[in-house]
Amino acid sequence: MTKKDEKGSNLDIPVSRLAESYKEKVVPALMERFQYKNIMMVPKLTKISINIGVGEAASEPKLLETAMQELAQITGQKPQIRKARKAISNFKLREGQPIGCRVTLRKKYMYEFLDRFVTLAVPRIRDFRGLSNTSFDGRGNYTLGIREQIIFPEIDIDKVPRIQGMDISFVTTARTDEEAFALLSELGMPFKKKNN
């Protein structure tokens, strides 16, 4: 697939394998399953947000730096620093203090990450029996927690100072959890089998 720049010449922009699969296989399958009248009604993935919370960043600022480097390696984008919204004395937390980092992926970067996540990272999870199918929010979005960042092949296990987890949110245009479940399943997410 080619696109044109401002002058009108063609630019070769590679389309990810998963983006092509969405157009060729997922859309027709969802159209048939949910009986959509229009192709624009078919749900699609709009963004993937990856968040690493580093609560100990107040006492050890180096932990936040390593979390940001690891997140940049995993996603290929520079992470945003997340700051505390309000002070909580029990946690020794002050307002505006850095407590984590986040990256939001869209379009081709989102599909590339999802492809790597499903094919390379998920099979490396210890004692994996399928992703939870109860983590939908009621509006068609799915969030899961990863306990170890070392499941991603971009992370060198020998250079990791400490194991830390992350939250990954998949935001879709689906109106119901059933539609979102079908969409993500068609895109290759290995969910646990539903007990009906």
UniProtKB/Swiss-Prot annotation:
Highest taxon listed in the record's lineage: Bacteria
Gene Ontology, cellular component aspect: ribonucleoprotein complex; ribosome
The family this protein is said to belong to: Belongs to the universal ribosomal protein uL5 family.
GO molecular function term, any single one: tRNA binding
Name the record gives this protein: Large ribosomal subunit protein uL5
InterPro entries in alphabetical order: Ribosomal_uL5, Ribosomal_uL5_bac-type, Ribosomal_uL5_C, Ribosomal_uL5_dom_sf, Ribosomal_uL5_N
GO BP field: translation
Functional description taken from the UniProt entry: This is one of the proteins that bind and probably mediate the attachment of the 5S RNA into the large ribosomal subunit, where it forms part of the central protuberance. In the 70S ribosome it contacts protein S13 of the 30S subunit (bridge B1b), connecting the 2 subunits; this bridge is implicated in subunit movement. Contacts the P site tRNA; the 5S rRNA and some of its associated proteins might help stabilize positioning of ribosome-bound tRNAs.
Assembly mode: Part of the 50S ribosomal subunit; part of the 5S rRNA/L5/L18/L25 subcomplex. Contacts the 5S rRNA and the P site tRNA. Forms a bridge to the 30S subunit in the 70S ribosome.
Keywords recorded for this protein, A-Z: Ribonucleoprotein, Ribosomal protein, RNA-binding, rRNA-binding, tRNA-binding
Disulfide bonds: none
Gene from which the chain derives: rplE
The organism's taxonomic lineage, starting at the top: Bacteria, Pseudomonadati, Chlorobiota, Chlorobiia, Chlorobiales
